[in-house]
Protein backbone atom coordinates (compact mmCIF):
# COMPACT_ATOMS: atom_id res chain seq x y z
CA UNK A 1 0.00 0.00 0.00
CA UNK A 2 1.26 3.46 -0.84
CA UNK A 3 1.08 5.29 2.48
CA UNK A 4 3.01 8.42 1.63
CA UNK A 5 0.43 10.10 -0.59
CA UNK A 6 -2.75 10.76 1.41
CA UNK A 7 -3.78 14.09 -0.03
CA UNK A 8 -6.41 12.55 -2.31
CA UNK A 9 -7.95 9.10 -3.00
CA UNK A 10 -5.54 6.72 -4.72
CA UNK A 11 -5.41 3.19 -5.99
CA UNK A 12 -2.43 0.92 -5.68
CA UNK A 13 -0.66 -0.23 -8.82
CA UNK A 14 1.20 -3.41 -9.64
CA UNK A 15 4.95 -3.81 -10.19
CA UNK A 16 5.79 -6.22 -12.99
CA UNK A 17 8.82 -8.55 -12.70
CA UNK A 18 10.94 -6.36 -15.03
CA UNK A 19 10.67 -3.32 -12.83
CA UNK A 20 8.18 -1.53 -15.06
CA UNK A 21 5.34 0.43 -13.49
CA UNK A 22 1.79 -0.26 -14.68
CA UNK A 23 -0.92 2.20 -13.78
CA UNK A 24 -4.35 0.90 -12.86
CA UNK A 25 -7.02 1.67 -15.46
CA UNK A 26 -9.02 4.48 -13.91
CA UNK A 27 -10.38 7.69 -15.33
CA UNK A 28 -10.92 9.54 -12.05
CA UNK A 29 -8.20 8.35 -9.68
CA UNK A 30 -4.48 8.98 -9.52
CA UNK A 31 -1.99 6.13 -9.34
CA UNK A 32 1.42 6.37 -7.72
CA UNK A 33 3.87 3.50 -7.39
CA UNK A 34 7.54 3.06 -6.88
CA UNK A 35 9.16 -0.29 -7.69
CA UNK A 36 11.44 -1.97 -5.19
CA UNK A 37 15.17 -2.20 -5.93
CA UNK A 38 14.77 -0.48 -9.30
CA UNK A 39 18.10 0.73 -10.79
CA UNK A 40 18.04 2.76 -13.98
CA UNK A 41 21.05 2.02 -16.22
CA UNK A 42 22.42 5.07 -18.06
CA UNK A 43 24.04 5.15 -21.47
CA UNK A 44 27.39 6.23 -19.95
CA UNK A 45 28.83 3.25 -17.97
CA UNK A 46 31.24 5.56 -16.09
CA UNK A 47 28.45 7.59 -14.59
CA UNK A 48 27.53 6.35 -11.12
CA UNK A 49 23.98 6.69 -9.78
CA UNK A 50 23.56 8.91 -6.71
CA UNK A 51 23.31 7.20 -3.33
CA UNK A 52 19.84 6.16 -2.24
CA UNK A 53 18.19 8.22 0.49
CA UNK A 54 17.55 6.56 3.87
CA UNK A 55 14.55 4.25 3.97
CA UNK A 56 11.55 6.01 5.54
CA UNK A 57 10.00 4.56 8.67
CA UNK A 58 6.39 4.69 9.89
CA UNK A 59 6.69 8.08 11.58
CA UNK A 60 8.26 9.70 8.54
CA UNK A 61 5.43 8.31 6.44
CA UNK A 62 2.95 10.07 8.71
CA UNK A 63 4.84 13.36 8.42
CA UNK A 64 5.03 13.11 4.65
CA UNK A 65 1.32 12.29 4.25
CA UNK A 66 0.61 15.43 2.24
CA UNK A 67 3.22 14.81 -0.48
CA UNK A 68 1.99 14.45 -4.05
CA UNK A 69 2.51 11.38 -6.20
CA UNK A 70 4.84 13.34 -8.50
CA UNK A 71 7.15 14.29 -5.63
CA UNK A 72 7.29 10.64 -4.63
CA UNK A 73 8.87 9.68 -7.91
CA UNK A 74 11.51 12.38 -7.44
CA UNK A 75 12.52 11.61 -3.85
CA UNK A 76 13.39 7.95 -4.42
CA UNK A 77 12.06 4.46 -3.79
CA UNK A 78 9.92 3.45 -0.87
CA UNK A 79 10.05 0.09 0.82
CA UNK A 80 7.15 -1.91 -0.55
CA UNK A 81 6.27 -5.53 0.03
CA UNK A 82 7.97 -8.07 -2.17
CA UNK A 83 4.74 -9.38 -3.62
CA UNK A 84 3.20 -7.37 -6.44
CA UNK A 85 0.14 -5.46 -5.36
CA UNK A 86 -3.25 -5.72 -7.00
CA UNK A 87 -4.54 -2.76 -8.95
CA UNK A 88 -7.89 -1.34 -8.00
CA UNK A 89 -10.13 -0.92 -11.01
CA UNK A 90 -13.23 1.19 -11.43
CA UNK A 91 -15.68 -1.61 -10.46
CA UNK A 92 -13.86 -1.95 -7.11
CA UNK A 93 -14.64 1.62 -6.10
CA UNK A 94 -18.02 2.38 -4.53
CA UNK A 95 -19.96 4.99 -6.42
CA UNK A 96 -23.01 7.07 -5.69
CA UNK A 97 -25.39 6.71 -8.62
CA UNK A 98 -27.53 9.60 -9.72
CA UNK A 99 -30.86 9.64 -7.99
CA UNK A 100 -29.56 8.03 -4.81
CA UNK A 101 -29.00 9.96 -1.64
CA UNK A 102 -25.78 11.80 -1.00
CA UNK A 103 -23.94 10.16 1.83
CA UNK A 104 -23.05 12.37 4.75
CA UNK A 105 -19.50 11.35 5.51
CA UNK A 106 -18.69 13.69 8.34
CA UNK A 107 -19.58 10.93 10.77
CA UNK A 108 -17.12 8.48 9.22
CA UNK A 109 -14.07 9.85 10.91
CA UNK A 110 -15.98 10.45 14.08
CA UNK A 111 -17.05 6.83 14.23
CA UNK A 112 -13.49 5.54 14.04
CA UNK A 113 -11.40 4.90 17.11
CA UNK A 114 -8.13 3.54 15.86
CA UNK A 115 -4.78 2.97 17.52
CA UNK A 116 -2.31 5.79 17.02
CA UNK A 117 0.07 3.71 14.95
CA UNK A 118 0.37 2.39 11.43
CA UNK A 119 2.16 -0.77 12.49
CA UNK A 120 -0.91 -2.84 11.57
CA UNK A 121 -0.60 -1.50 8.02
CA UNK A 122 3.07 -2.49 7.73
CA UNK A 123 2.60 -6.21 8.23
CA UNK A 124 5.26 -8.48 6.83
CA UNK A 125 2.58 -10.63 5.23
CA UNK A 126 1.64 -9.67 1.71
CA UNK A 127 -2.08 -8.93 1.52
CA UNK A 128 -3.89 -7.94 -1.63
CA UNK A 129 -6.77 -6.47 0.35
CA UNK A 130 -4.46 -4.46 2.56
CA UNK A 131 -2.46 -3.08 -0.36
CA UNK A 132 -5.43 -2.12 -2.47
CA UNK A 133 -7.69 -0.64 0.21
CA UNK A 134 -7.54 2.16 2.73
CA UNK A 135 -9.93 4.29 4.74
CA UNK A 136 -10.65 6.34 1.64
CA UNK A 137 -11.19 3.27 -0.52
CA UNK A 138 -14.49 2.59 1.25
CA UNK A 139 -15.80 6.13 0.82
CA UNK A 140 -18.39 6.62 -1.97
CA UNK A 141 -16.93 8.37 -5.02
CA UNK A 142 -17.80 12.03 -5.40
CA UNK A 143 -17.08 14.81 -7.80
CA UNK A 144 -13.76 16.63 -7.55
CA UNK A 145 -15.41 19.76 -6.25
CA UNK A 146 -16.75 17.90 -3.22
CA UNK A 147 -13.49 16.15 -2.37
CA UNK A 148 -12.36 18.64 0.25
CA UNK A 149 -15.65 18.49 2.14
CA UNK A 150 -15.87 14.69 2.02
CA UNK A 151 -12.38 14.08 3.36
CA UNK A 152 -12.14 17.16 5.54
CA UNK A 153 -12.22 15.24 8.82
CA UNK A 154 -9.66 12.70 7.65
CA UNK A 155 -7.27 15.41 6.48
CA UNK A 156 -7.79 17.25 9.75
CA UNK A 157 -6.89 14.08 11.62
CA UNK A 158 -3.64 13.78 9.69
CA UNK A 159 -2.73 17.41 10.33
CA UNK A 160 -2.85 16.96 14.10
CA UNK A 161 -6.42 17.99 14.98
CA UNK A 162 -7.15 14.56 16.41
CA UNK A 163 -5.98 14.17 19.99
CA UNK A 164 -4.78 11.08 21.78
CA UNK A 165 -5.99 10.09 25.21
CA UNK A 166 -4.21 8.11 27.88
CA UNK A 167 -5.38 4.77 26.49
CA UNK A 168 -3.67 5.32 23.16
CA UNK A 169 -6.96 5.73 21.29
CA UNK A 170 -7.58 8.52 18.84
CA UNK A 171 -10.27 10.93 19.96
CA UNK A 172 -12.09 12.06 16.82
CA UNK A 173 -13.97 15.36 16.85
CA UNK A 174 -17.46 13.85 16.50
CA UNK A 175 -17.26 12.16 19.92
CA UNK A 176 -15.33 14.75 21.87
CA UNK A 177 -17.04 16.78 24.54
CA UNK A 178 -19.99 18.50 22.88
CA UNK A 179 -19.97 22.27 23.01
CA UNK A 180 -23.60 22.21 21.87
CA UNK A 181 -24.85 20.37 24.93
CA UNK A 182 -25.58 23.56 26.85
CA UNK A 183 -28.10 24.78 24.30
CA UNK A 184 -29.40 21.44 23.00
CA UNK A 185 -32.17 21.51 25.59
CA UNK A 186 -33.38 24.76 23.99
CA UNK A 187 -34.24 22.71 20.91
CA UNK A 188 -37.48 21.60 22.55
CA UNK A 189 -38.54 24.94 24.02
CA UNK A 190 -41.42 26.81 22.32
CA UNK A 191 -40.51 29.71 20.08
CA UNK A 192 -43.48 31.79 21.23
CA UNK A 193 -46.20 33.50 19.24
CA UNK A 194 -46.34 36.69 17.26
CA UNK A 195 -48.50 39.06 19.28
CA UNK A 196 -50.64 41.73 17.69
CA UNK A 197 -49.42 45.21 18.46
CA UNK A 198 -46.08 43.87 19.64
CA UNK A 199 -42.91 44.18 17.59
CA UNK A 200 -41.70 40.65 18.35
CA UNK A 201 -42.06 38.98 14.95
CA UNK A 202 -38.34 39.20 14.16
CA UNK A 203 -37.39 37.77 17.56
CA UNK A 204 -39.80 34.85 17.23
CA UNK A 205 -38.61 34.18 13.68
CA UNK A 206 -34.97 34.11 14.81
CA UNK A 207 -35.84 31.57 17.49
CA UNK A 208 -37.58 29.46 14.87
CA UNK A 209 -34.56 29.60 12.57
CA UNK A 210 -32.21 28.62 15.42
CA UNK A 211 -33.84 25.20 15.77
CA UNK A 212 -31.67 22.41 14.40
CA UNK A 213 -34.59 20.33 13.20
CA UNK A 214 -38.04 21.07 11.81
CA UNK A 215 -40.98 18.92 10.77
CA UNK A 216 -43.74 20.33 8.57
CA UNK A 217 -46.97 18.78 7.36
CA UNK A 218 -48.92 20.59 4.64
CA UNK A 219 -51.63 19.73 2.17
CA UNK A 220 -51.27 19.59 -1.59
CA UNK A 221 -53.19 22.87 -1.69
CA UNK A 222 -50.40 24.52 0.32
CA UNK A 223 -52.22 24.78 3.65
CA UNK A 224 -50.05 24.24 6.75
CA UNK A 225 -51.42 21.41 8.89
CA UNK A 226 -48.81 20.96 11.62
CA UNK A 227 -45.32 22.13 12.45
CA UNK A 228 -43.11 21.12 15.33
CA UNK A 229 -41.93 24.68 15.99
CA UNK A 230 -44.00 27.81 15.60
CA UNK A 231 -47.48 28.03 14.12
CA UNK A 232 -49.08 28.31 10.70
CA UNK A 233 -49.01 32.11 10.67
CA UNK A 234 -45.28 32.22 11.40
CA UNK A 235 -44.24 29.70 8.74
CA UNK A 236 -46.85 30.45 6.06
CA UNK A 237 -44.26 32.10 3.81
CA UNK A 238 -41.90 29.14 4.03
CA UNK A 239 -44.73 26.67 3.49
CA UNK A 240 -45.63 28.49 0.27
CA UNK A 241 -42.04 28.26 -0.96
CA UNK A 242 -41.82 24.54 -0.17
CA UNK A 243 -45.16 23.85 -1.86
CA UNK A 244 -44.00 25.72 -4.97
CA UNK A 245 -40.78 23.71 -5.18
CA UNK A 246 -42.65 20.40 -4.81
CA UNK A 247 -45.24 21.41 -7.43
CA UNK A 248 -42.48 22.40 -9.87
CA UNK A 249 -41.10 18.87 -9.85
CA UNK A 250 -44.54 17.28 -10.02
CA UNK A 251 -45.38 19.31 -13.11
CA UNK A 252 -42.32 17.70 -14.73
CA UNK A 253 -43.59 14.20 -13.86
CA UNK A 254 -40.92 13.94 -11.18
CA UNK A 255 -41.03 13.60 -7.40
CA UNK A 256 -38.80 15.65 -5.16
CA UNK A 257 -37.23 13.45 -2.51
CA UNK A 258 -34.47 15.54 -0.97
CA UNK A 259 -32.03 18.36 -1.51
CA UNK A 260 -29.25 20.01 0.48
CA UNK A 261 -28.50 23.69 1.07
CA UNK A 262 -25.23 24.23 2.92
CA UNK A 263 -25.29 22.03 6.02
CA UNK A 264 -29.10 21.68 5.96
CA UNK A 265 -30.84 18.66 4.47
CA UNK A 266 -34.44 18.80 3.21
CA UNK A 267 -36.40 15.55 2.79
CA UNK A 268 -39.90 15.39 1.32
CA UNK A 269 -42.33 12.46 1.53
CA UNK A 270 -45.64 12.56 -0.35
CA UNK A 271 -48.55 10.53 1.03
CA UNK A 272 -51.68 11.10 -1.01
CA UNK A 273 -52.85 14.68 -0.47
CA UNK A 274 -50.27 15.33 2.27
CA UNK A 275 -46.68 16.53 2.08
CA UNK A 276 -44.31 15.68 4.93
CA UNK A 277 -41.12 17.74 5.13
CA UNK A 278 -38.10 17.30 7.41
CA UNK A 279 -35.42 19.99 7.69
CA UNK A 280 -32.35 18.86 9.62
CA UNK A 281 -28.94 20.27 10.55
CA UNK A 282 -27.88 17.39 12.81
CA UNK A 283 -26.25 15.12 10.22
CA UNK A 284 -28.89 12.51 9.39
CA UNK A 285 -29.22 10.60 6.16
CA UNK A 286 -32.12 10.82 3.74
CA UNK A 287 -33.21 7.30 4.67
CA UNK A 288 -33.36 8.13 8.38
CA UNK A 289 -35.40 11.28 7.82
CA UNK A 290 -37.72 9.48 5.42
CA UNK A 291 -38.49 6.80 8.03
CA UNK A 292 -39.24 9.52 10.57
CA UNK A 293 -41.69 11.24 8.23
CA UNK A 294 -43.43 7.95 7.51
CA UNK A 295 -43.81 7.42 11.27
CA UNK A 296 -45.53 10.82 11.52
CA UNK A 297 -47.86 9.73 8.72
CA UNK A 298 -48.72 6.57 10.67
CA UNK A 299 -49.43 8.74 13.70
CA UNK A 300 -51.99 10.70 11.67
CA UNK A 301 -53.57 7.47 10.43
CA UNK A 302 -53.83 6.22 14.02
CA UNK A 303 -56.13 9.18 14.67
CA UNK A 304 -58.13 9.46 11.43
CA UNK A 305 -57.80 6.09 9.61
CA UNK A 306 -56.96 6.01 5.91
CA UNK A 307 -60.57 5.96 4.57
CA UNK A 308 -61.49 9.04 6.61
CA UNK A 309 -58.40 10.90 5.43
CA UNK A 310 -59.07 10.00 1.80
CA UNK A 311 -62.73 10.97 2.04
CA UNK A 312 -61.98 14.40 3.53
CA UNK A 313 -59.73 15.42 0.64
CA UNK A 314 -61.82 13.78 -2.08
CA UNK A 315 -64.84 15.85 -1.08
CA UNK A 316 -62.85 19.06 -0.57
CA UNK A 317 -59.19 19.17 -1.72
CA UNK A 318 -58.57 22.38 0.25
CA UNK A 319 -59.72 20.80 3.52
CA UNK A 320 -58.11 22.19 6.66
CA UNK A 321 -56.96 19.11 8.56
CA UNK A 322 -56.23 20.99 11.78
CA UNK A 323 -59.70 20.46 13.22
CA UNK A 324 -59.86 16.67 12.62
CA UNK A 325 -56.37 16.35 14.16
CA UNK A 326 -57.16 18.58 17.12
CA UNK A 327 -55.84 16.93 20.27
CA UNK A 328 -53.24 14.80 18.49
CA UNK A 329 -50.70 17.62 18.06
CA UNK A 330 -49.09 16.60 21.34
CA UNK A 331 -48.59 13.05 20.08
CA UNK A 332 -47.01 14.33 16.87
CA UNK A 333 -44.69 16.64 18.80
CA UNK A 334 -43.73 13.89 21.23
CA UNK A 335 -42.91 11.51 18.40
CA UNK A 336 -40.91 14.18 16.58
CA UNK A 337 -38.91 15.00 19.72
CA UNK A 338 -38.06 11.34 20.20
CA UNK A 339 -36.44 11.40 16.75
CA UNK A 340 -34.47 14.52 17.61
CA UNK A 341 -33.28 13.09 20.92
CA UNK A 342 -32.18 9.91 19.18
CA UNK A 343 -34.63 7.31 20.53
CA UNK A 344 -33.17 3.93 19.47
CA UNK A 345 -36.55 2.23 19.04
CA UNK A 346 -37.87 4.90 16.68
CA UNK A 347 -34.67 5.36 14.67
CA UNK A 348 -34.00 1.61 14.37
CA UNK A 349 -37.66 0.62 13.79
CA UNK A 350 -37.19 -2.13 16.36
CA UNK A 351 -38.25 -2.99 19.90
CA UNK A 352 -36.26 -3.33 23.08
CA UNK A 353 -37.19 -6.04 25.57
CA UNK A 354 -36.67 -5.86 29.31
CA UNK A 355 -33.66 -7.97 30.28
CA UNK A 356 -34.87 -10.78 32.57
CA UNK A 357 -34.17 -14.49 32.79
CA UNK A 358 -35.86 -16.79 30.31
CA UNK A 359 -37.54 -18.77 33.10
CA UNK A 360 -39.02 -15.61 34.59
CA UNK A 361 -40.32 -14.45 31.21
CA UNK A 362 -41.86 -17.88 30.65
CA UNK A 363 -43.80 -17.56 33.92
CA UNK A 364 -45.09 -14.11 32.94
CA UNK A 365 -46.13 -15.37 29.50
CA UNK A 366 -48.09 -18.27 30.99
CA UNK A 367 -49.76 -15.98 33.51
CA UNK A 368 -50.87 -13.64 30.74
CA UNK A 369 -52.19 -16.55 28.66
CA UNK A 370 -54.18 -18.02 31.55
CA UNK A 371 -55.78 -14.65 32.33
CA UNK A 372 -56.96 -13.81 28.81
CA UNK A 373 -60.63 -13.30 27.98
CA UNK A 374 -62.56 -13.96 24.77
CA UNK A 375 -62.63 -10.34 23.61
CA UNK A 376 -58.84 -9.96 23.86
CA UNK A 377 -56.94 -9.44 20.59
CA UNK A 378 -53.52 -8.36 21.90
CA UNK A 379 -52.17 -8.32 25.43
CA UNK A 380 -48.91 -6.67 26.44
CA UNK A 381 -46.90 -6.08 29.59
CA UNK A 382 -44.56 -3.12 29.11
CA UNK A 383 -42.02 -1.78 31.60
CA UNK A 384 -40.41 1.60 31.04
CA UNK A 385 -41.03 1.47 27.30
CA UNK A 386 -39.48 -2.01 27.05
CA UNK A 387 -41.52 -5.08 26.18
CA UNK A 388 -41.86 -7.77 28.86
CA UNK A 389 -44.49 -10.09 27.40
CA UNK A 390 -47.05 -10.19 24.60
CA UNK A 391 -49.89 -12.52 23.58
CA UNK A 392 -51.45 -12.37 20.12
CA UNK A 393 -53.38 -14.49 17.63
CA UNK A 394 -51.28 -17.03 15.76
CA UNK A 395 -51.56 -15.34 12.36
CA UNK A 396 -51.61 -11.70 13.50
CA UNK A 397 -48.25 -10.31 14.55
CA UNK A 398 -47.87 -6.73 15.73
CA UNK A 399 -46.09 -4.38 13.35
CA UNK A 400 -43.08 -2.62 14.97
CA UNK A 401 -44.41 0.74 13.78
CA UNK A 402 -47.73 0.06 15.51
CA UNK A 403 -45.97 -0.80 18.76
CA UNK A 404 -43.91 2.37 18.55
CA UNK A 405 -47.10 4.40 18.17
CA UNK A 406 -48.60 2.64 21.17
CA UNK A 407 -45.52 3.14 23.34
CA UNK A 408 -45.27 6.79 22.35
CA UNK A 409 -48.94 7.32 23.16
CA UNK A 410 -48.81 5.41 26.45
CA UNK A 411 -45.57 6.64 27.99
CA UNK A 412 -45.15 10.12 26.51
CA UNK A 413 -48.70 11.53 26.53
CA UNK A 414 -49.48 12.80 30.02
CA UNK A 415 -53.24 12.61 29.45
CA UNK A 416 -53.11 8.80 29.28
CA UNK A 417 -52.05 8.57 32.94
CA UNK A 418 -55.04 10.57 34.16
CA UNK A 419 -58.05 8.88 35.67
CA UNK A 420 -56.12 6.86 38.25
CA UNK A 421 -53.77 5.33 35.70
CA UNK A 422 -56.60 3.72 33.71
CA UNK A 423 -57.63 4.68 30.16
CA UNK A 424 -59.88 3.48 27.32
CA UNK A 425 -58.61 4.72 23.95
CA UNK A 426 -59.83 4.09 20.39
CA UNK A 427 -56.81 3.75 18.13
CA UNK A 428 -56.06 2.75 14.55
CA UNK A 429 -52.99 0.55 14.06
CA UNK A 430 -52.02 1.18 10.41
CA UNK A 431 -49.73 -1.84 10.23
CA UNK A 432 -52.57 -4.10 11.36
CA UNK A 433 -55.52 -2.44 9.63
CA UNK A 434 -55.48 1.16 8.40
CA UNK A 435 -59.24 1.14 7.74
CA UNK A 436 -60.69 0.69 11.21
CA UNK A 437 -60.31 1.27 14.92
CA UNK A 438 -59.29 -0.99 17.76
CA UNK A 439 -59.95 -0.26 21.42
CA UNK A 440 -57.13 -0.17 23.92
CA UNK A 441 -57.36 -0.56 27.67
CA UNK A 442 -54.31 0.84 29.49
CA UNK A 443 -53.56 0.51 33.19
CA UNK A 444 -50.37 1.74 34.87
CA UNK A 445 -48.80 0.02 37.86
CA UNK A 446 -46.50 1.72 40.33
CA UNK A 447 -43.92 -0.74 41.66
CA UNK A 448 -42.40 1.59 44.25
CA UNK A 449 -42.43 0.07 47.71
CA UNK A 450 -44.13 3.04 49.37
CA UNK A 451 -47.07 3.19 46.96
CA UNK A 452 -50.09 1.22 45.87
CA UNK A 453 -50.26 -0.69 42.62
CA UNK A 454 -51.96 2.14 40.77
CA UNK A 455 -49.57 4.72 39.33
CA UNK A 456 -50.02 8.41 40.04
CA UNK A 457 -48.76 11.58 38.37
CA UNK A 458 -45.39 11.38 40.15
CA UNK A 459 -44.54 8.01 38.62
CA UNK A 460 -41.83 8.34 36.01
CA UNK A 461 -41.70 6.44 32.76
CA UNK A 462 -38.94 4.13 34.01
CA UNK A 463 -40.73 3.36 37.29
CA UNK A 464 -44.11 2.38 35.88
CA UNK A 465 -45.37 -0.82 34.31
CA UNK A 466 -48.25 -0.71 31.84
CA UNK A 467 -50.81 -3.43 31.20
CA UNK A 468 -52.08 -2.94 27.62
CA UNK A 469 -55.10 -4.93 26.45
CA UNK A 470 -56.48 -4.42 22.92
CA UNK A 471 -59.83 -5.56 21.58
CA UNK A 472 -62.00 -5.14 18.51
CA UNK A 473 -65.11 -4.78 20.71
CA UNK A 474 -65.76 -1.24 21.86
CA UNK A 475 -68.02 -2.55 24.66
CA UNK A 476 -65.36 -4.74 26.28
CA UNK A 477 -63.96 -2.22 28.77
CA UNK A 478 -65.23 -3.92 31.93
CA UNK A 479 -64.26 -7.37 30.70
CA UNK A 480 -60.69 -6.20 30.05
CA UNK A 481 -60.65 -4.38 33.38
CA UNK A 482 -61.49 -7.62 35.16
CA UNK A 483 -58.75 -9.40 33.22
CA UNK A 484 -56.27 -6.76 34.33
CA UNK A 485 -57.20 -7.25 38.00
CA UNK A 486 -56.79 -11.02 37.77
CA UNK A 487 -53.49 -10.66 35.93
CA UNK A 488 -51.99 -8.28 38.51
CA UNK A 489 -53.11 -10.56 41.34
CA UNK A 490 -51.40 -13.59 39.78
CA UNK A 491 -48.22 -11.63 38.98
CA UNK A 492 -48.01 -10.64 42.64
CA UNK A 493 -48.49 -14.20 43.84
CA UNK A 494 -45.71 -15.64 41.67
CA UNK A 495 -43.40 -12.68 42.46
CA UNK A 496 -43.21 -11.64 38.80
CA UNK A 497 -43.84 -7.99 39.66
CA UNK A 498 -40.82 -8.11 41.97
CA UNK A 499 -38.73 -9.60 39.15
CA UNK A 500 -39.82 -6.79 36.83
CA UNK A 501 -39.04 -4.15 39.47
CA UNK A 502 -35.53 -5.53 40.04
CA UNK A 503 -34.87 -5.59 36.28
CA UNK A 504 -35.99 -1.96 36.00
CA UNK A 505 -33.74 -0.93 38.90
CA UNK A 506 -30.72 -2.67 37.36
CA UNK A 507 -31.20 -0.89 34.05
CA UNK A 508 -29.14 -1.69 30.99
CA UNK A 509 -25.88 -3.55 31.68
CA UNK A 510 -22.53 -1.83 31.28
CA UNK A 511 -20.04 -3.31 28.84
CA UNK A 512 -17.75 -4.22 31.74
CA UNK A 513 -20.59 -6.21 33.32
CA UNK A 514 -20.66 -8.42 30.23
CA UNK A 515 -16.91 -8.56 29.49
CA UNK A 516 -14.86 -7.48 32.53
CA UNK A 517 -11.93 -5.27 31.63
CA UNK A 518 -13.11 -4.55 28.09
CA UNK A 519 -12.17 -1.26 26.43
CA UNK A 520 -15.52 -1.19 24.62
CA UNK A 521 -17.53 1.81 25.79
CA UNK A 522 -20.91 1.04 24.25
CA UNK A 523 -22.62 -1.41 21.90
CA UNK A 524 -25.97 -1.75 20.17
CA UNK A 525 -27.16 -4.93 18.44
CA UNK A 526 -30.26 -5.25 16.28
CA UNK A 527 -31.77 -8.57 15.25
CA UNK A 528 -33.48 -8.01 11.93
CA UNK A 529 -35.25 -11.38 12.10
CA UNK A 530 -36.85 -10.59 15.48
CA UNK A 531 -37.14 -6.83 14.89
CA UNK A 532 -35.56 -6.30 18.31
CA UNK A 533 -32.45 -4.63 19.62
CA UNK A 534 -30.37 -4.70 22.77
CA UNK A 535 -27.81 -2.21 23.97
CA UNK A 536 -25.48 -1.42 26.84
CA UNK A 537 -25.82 1.46 29.25
CA UNK A 538 -25.08 4.94 27.94
CA UNK A 539 -23.12 5.93 31.04
CA UNK A 540 -20.53 7.28 31.39
CA UNK A 541 -19.36 7.94 27.82
CA UNK A 542 -22.74 8.92 26.34
CA UNK A 543 -24.43 10.76 29.17
CA UNK A 544 -25.36 13.83 27.11
CA UNK A 545 -28.33 13.98 24.76
CA UNK A 546 -26.27 15.05 21.76
CA UNK A 547 -23.74 12.22 22.19
CA UNK A 548 -26.52 9.65 22.60
CA UNK A 549 -28.28 10.91 19.51
CA UNK A 550 -25.05 10.81 17.52
CA UNK A 551 -24.23 7.23 18.55
CA UNK A 552 -27.72 5.95 17.70
CA UNK A 553 -27.71 7.84 14.40
CA UNK A 554 -24.48 6.09 13.41
CA UNK A 555 -25.92 2.71 14.43
CA UNK A 556 -29.07 3.17 12.37
Swiss-Prot record:
One of its GO terms (cellular component) is multivesicular body membrane. GO terms for biological process: autophagy; protein targeting to vacuole; vesicle-mediated transport. Residues 1-80 are annotated as: Disordered. Pfam families: Fuz_longin_1, Fuz_longin_2, Fuz_longin_3. Residues 47-56 have a biased composition (Pro residues). It is found in: Endosome, Multivesicular body membrane; Prevacuolar compartment membrane; Vacuole membrane. It is a peripheral membrane protein. Keywords: Autophagy, Endosome, Membrane, Protein transport, Transport, Vacuole. Residues 1-13, 24-45, 68-80 have a biased composition (Polar residues). In complex with CCZ1, is required for multiple vacuole delivery pathways including the cytoplasm to vacuole transport (Cvt), autophagy, pexophagy and endocytosis. The MON1-CCZ1 complex acts at the fusion of vesicles with the vacuole, through its regulation of the SNARE complex during the coordinated priming and docking stages of fusion, and particularly at the stage of tethering/docking. Belongs to the MON1/SAND family. This is Vacuolar fusion protein mon1.
